């Protein structure tokens, strides 16, 4: 309904659109808006405040329209770049081959062409094509460096960022063969001449120092095996990023079962077993990892090899770490390490091995790492270590069959336990009892308060590893035949709790004793629950797993496999 007396707008719109609010020209939205506003101002009750609100809404909508137009423009640029790079791959067969002589005018034309005369797409296409055609042997030339920045100028929204990552992923796939040719470094410190391993194995050169392939002092077979193992350890750049994230130290960050709405009323973290292990870090130790230890208090991992201990920080964000925070090398010529032990308070690290005059106690609480105590063991080769900080005692088992006890306050020898003809391979201490196992398949229990002979429990296979339950009266045995046994510490009761397919090399109870980790020659990290030893799940590794450890906060597991260690984060 209209009225002839109703005033009309001063100026009608110059153009109209079949759809309201949509126009082909940039000036039309302004005229439409002004016309509508002038109509509204003719009403006597039209508030100036309402006019200001409409003005603000209009400019906001206009800004959104400009952003959408800019967004479409950026997507068009990215698609043009991808299309140009795809076309260049089809033209490579028409280019001049290295064996054919190029015309004299061709290099001159490339030389005379400047960056000012080239568009952004031409520069991207030229460098990308040159990088894709370059042989692997020319990686040392400056032109092989990737041409894009970490944050290109057109990263303004999520969609464009994802498109750019898809485009960059094409180059990551092409770069895989080139990356695998690079030799990984073993650390920041070079090894001393006296730190070589005894026996027939020659001293390997420091891999962190560049050298030609023919200059290697190791035999061809050894170098081939070492390169092969590194190729297995290294993951392609595209796959390593799936666990490229920081390790969580905040309990609120975990989606554990007892926090879920469907959790049972009595469910508690002390009764839970892991439901998932997520690989968070690979630590490239550089030689066979013989023992590992992890501290959630200091947030460090300790990896033990024949030539020394390497200390790794867990606070960074890197998928594969090649550079340890510290390196504790062997200084005695002809000696090598065999094992290490982190004290329960994470303030000390005990190390022992072969041809060493003592077991070293490293001070982890000092500003700089140093040996604060030497526990004498001249002429003995250490196999395993344990400690009781409440009683200030340290324990070690040796290949000669001796178990030695030291007083940590004055480093004196308290007692030597003898009677193992085939040596002692593993040792655990719980209360006043010392449990030992070895190649003779006999589990022995010594009481520190008496001088009586130990209790003996005979098994049918060699005892490779021991671990005591922190909450119950059980000792866990890992056997050479793949069996796992629980032996009661208060009686003769025992039962088998699962079996692996090959030799078990290490077992470790969790801090609450509700599950344990088991590793061995089957290339798997297995998680088993108490008390029946039900297998919860297994995590595959690339090679036999020699050792494992569980952090005191019940959140991390570290394993040693080949020349590297893996750090897993636990979700319950």
UniProtKB/Swiss-Prot annotation:
SMART domains: WD40. It is found in: Cytoplasm; Nucleus. GO terms for cellular component: cell cortex; cytoplasm; cytoplasmic lattice; nucleus; protein-containing complex; sperm midpiece; subcortical maternal complex; transcription regulator complex. Residues 1-30, 92-121, 174-236 are annotated as: Disordered. Changing residue 338 to H: In OZEMA15; uncertain significance. Changing residue 396 to T: In OZEMA15; impaired formation of the SCMC complex. Changing residue 240 to G: In OZEMA15; uncertain significance. WD repeats lie at residues 284-322, 332-372, 377-416, 419-456, 458-497, 499-538, 540-571. Pfam families: WD40 (PF00400). One of its GO terms (molecular function) is transcription corepressor activity. Keywords: Cytoplasm, Disease variant, Nucleus, Phosphoprotein, Repeat, Transcription, Transcription regulation, WD repeat. It is linked to Oocyte/zygote/embryo maturation arrest 15: A rare cause of female primary infertility. In affected women, ovulation proceeds normally and the retrieved oocytes appear normal, but zygote formation and division are severely impaired. Inheritance is autosomal recessive. Belongs to the WD repeat Groucho/TLE family. Component of the subcortical maternal complex (SCMC), a multiprotein complex that plays a key role in early embryonic development. The SCMC complex is a structural constituent of cytoplasmic lattices, which consist in fibrous structures found in the cytoplasm of oocytes and preimplantation embryos. They are required to store maternal proteins critical for embryonic development, such as proteins that control epigenetic reprogramming of the preimplantation embryo, and prevent their degradation or activation. This is Transducin-like enhancer protein 6.
